[in-house]
């Protein structure tokens, strides 16, 4: 196959995947700008993407582009070095700066990939992956001692940029990205034949401006995010509390509905019993059986529900201090159910006191 067997074909694949990745990086920097200018809209975008099928398809497609780009880059690098030493592209009259980036594209690519891994661990793994795996609330990442839900992207920005090393690593990654994109941007056009004396200078100029604007925005955003994280801006912003509250209300509703559904399923076999047709002994036996089933359910599922609600209440109180939890009907019902279950669990765990008979 031409795209695999020929050097030109492999360079063409590199060019096509490179174009797609440049467009993605441009989209990413614009989305980051939304987090600064309209943080509520940024959270809405994060929730929209989430673990929905279209987001998963896009993520897999993007991952495939990166893998193809990296594999072909390594392939071409080793092929070119075997044939022409360290020269990787036959290009006319390069500037010294471009010459350096051309000779070090592999090293720059490795730095960019390392930075990408850090970025994925800080964001994708804690957000979309958590949603995809349906991890329990108890294992959610913590910010200021409170759990953070996967869809609340602004809180993950604050969590990441609270770390003193984050802006340093990001800026190093952005500088490497500038060199890598600046050379890769125009060289991909050179690959498809746009390398004459008229177009090559224009493409180099476009590449430098485009890359410089994108990377400058990334660096500015990293600085702004760091300053905001140090001030706990996103976790304390009054305009975001309604959004955080809505997310916790949904969690409370889901937990309550799940508990209620399981409770109804457990008690379903006993709903249509006609105790009037039973003997006293049979009634006592059934009553004891129902009591045992209820106690087992409360001990197992009730404990799980209480633990979920403890996490929800902790997150809600930390992120929505100005909002009354009882303003949401399902949240209020869930909190009441939790309080009742806690009382029952405490009573069930308390051993009976030995009662001395009266003399």
Cite the ranges covered by each PLM segment.
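Membrane-embedded alpha-helical bundles that constitute the cytochrome b-like, heme-associated redox core
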Residues: 1-359
């Amino acid at each position: 196959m031409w795209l695999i067997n020929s050097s030109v074909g492999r360079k063409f694949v590199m060019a096509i995947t490179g174009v797609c990745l440049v467009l993605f990086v441009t989209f990413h920097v614009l989305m980051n700008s939304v987090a600064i200018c309209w943080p509520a809209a940024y959270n809405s975008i994060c929730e929209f993407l989430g673990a929905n099928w279209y987001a998963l398809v896009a993520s897999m497609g993007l991952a495939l582009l990166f893998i193809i780009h990296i594999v072909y880059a390594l392939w071409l690098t080793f092929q070119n070095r075997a044939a022409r030493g360290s020269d990787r592209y036959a290009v006319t009259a390069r500037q010294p700066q471009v010459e350096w980036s051309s000779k070090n594209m592999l090293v720059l690519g490795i730095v960019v990939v390392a930075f990408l891994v850090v970025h994925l661990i800080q964001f994708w793994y804690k957000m979309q992956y958590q949603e995809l795996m349906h991890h329990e609330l108890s294992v959610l990442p913590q910010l200021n001692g409170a759990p953070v839900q996967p869809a609340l992207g602004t809180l993950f920005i604050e969590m990441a940029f609270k770390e003193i090393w984050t802006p340093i690593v990001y800026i190093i990654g952005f500088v490497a990205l500038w060199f890598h994109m600046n050379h890769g941007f125009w060289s991909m056009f050179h690959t498809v034949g746009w390398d004459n004396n008229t177009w090559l200078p224009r493409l180099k100029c476009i590449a430098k401006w485009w890359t410089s604007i994108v990377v400058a925005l990334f660096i500015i955003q990293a600085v702004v995010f760091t300053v905001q994280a140090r001030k706990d801006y996103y976790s304390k912003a009054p305009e975001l509390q309604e959004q955080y509250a809505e997310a916790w209300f949904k969690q409370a509703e889901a937990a309550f509905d799940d508990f209620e559904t399981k409770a109804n399923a457990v008690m379903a076999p006993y709903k249509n019993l006609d105790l009037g047709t039973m003997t006293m002994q049979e009634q006592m036996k059934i009553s004891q059986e129902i009591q045992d089933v209820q106690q087992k359910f409360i001990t197992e599922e009730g404990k799980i529900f209480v633990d979920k609600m403890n996490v929800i209440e902790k997150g809600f109180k930390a992120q929505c201090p100005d909002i009354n939890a009882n303003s949401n009907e399902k949240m209020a019902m869930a909190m009441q159910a939790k309080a009742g279950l806690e009382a029952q669990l405490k009573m069930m765990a308390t051993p009976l006191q030995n009662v001395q008979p009266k003399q």
